[in-house]
Amino acid sequence: MSAIFNFQSLLTVILLLICTCAYIRSLAPSLLDRNKTGLLGIFWKCARIGERKSPYVAVCCIVMAFSILFIQ
């Protein structure tokens, strides 16, 4: 089933996107800072969310990991 139609899979993909973009921006900031607007601006926005809300994103990742490991 596609991640678009399954809510838990959609949340997992969004969390992975946020974490990946924040990690890439920490390694190479100029890579994401070039595209702050437009379609590629989504990755810059995800990186900003990952940087600013990192405790909340970390808690969401832990909760999602436990739900995938133990509930499914």
Swiss-Prot record:
<feature type="signal peptide">
    <location>
        <begin position="1"/>
        <end position="26"/>
    </location>
</feature>
<keyword id="KW-0333">Golgi apparatus</keyword>
<keyword id="KW-0325">Glycoprotein</keyword>
<dbReference type="InterPro" id="IPR051523">
    <property type="entry name" value="KISH_domain"/>
</dbReference>
<keyword id="KW-1133">Transmembrane helix</keyword>
<dbReference type="GO" id="GO:0045054">
    <property type="term" value="P:constitutive secretory pathway"/>
</dbReference>
<dbReference type="Pfam" id="PF06842">
    <property type="entry name" value="DUF1242"/>
</dbReference>
<protein>
    <recommendedName>
        <fullName>Protein kish-A</fullName>
    </recommendedName>
</protein>
<feature type="transmembrane region" description="Helical">
    <location>
        <begin position="54"/>
        <end position="71"/>
    </location>
</feature>
<feature type="topological domain" description="Cytoplasmic">
    <location>
        <position position="72"/>
    </location>
</feature>
<dbReference type="GO" id="GO:0009306">
    <property type="term" value="P:protein secretion"/>
</dbReference>
<comment type="similarity">
    <text>Belongs to the KISH family.</text>
</comment>
<feature type="topological domain" description="Extracellular">
    <location>
        <begin position="27"/>
        <end position="53"/>
    </location>
</feature>
<dbReference type="GO" id="GO:0005794">
    <property type="term" value="C:Golgi apparatus"/>
</dbReference>
<comment type="function">
    <text>Involved in the early part of the secretory pathway.</text>
</comment>
<dbReference type="GO" id="GO:0000139">
    <property type="term" value="C:Golgi membrane"/>
</dbReference>
<dbReference type="GO" id="GO:0046907">
    <property type="term" value="P:intracellular transport"/>
</dbReference>
<feature type="glycosylation site" description="N-linked (GlcNAc...) asparagine">
    <location>
        <position position="35"/>
    </location>
</feature>
<keyword id="KW-0732">Signal</keyword>
<dbReference type="InterPro" id="IPR009653">
    <property type="entry name" value="Ksh1"/>
</dbReference>
<keyword id="KW-0472">Membrane</keyword>
<keyword id="KW-0812">Transmembrane</keyword>
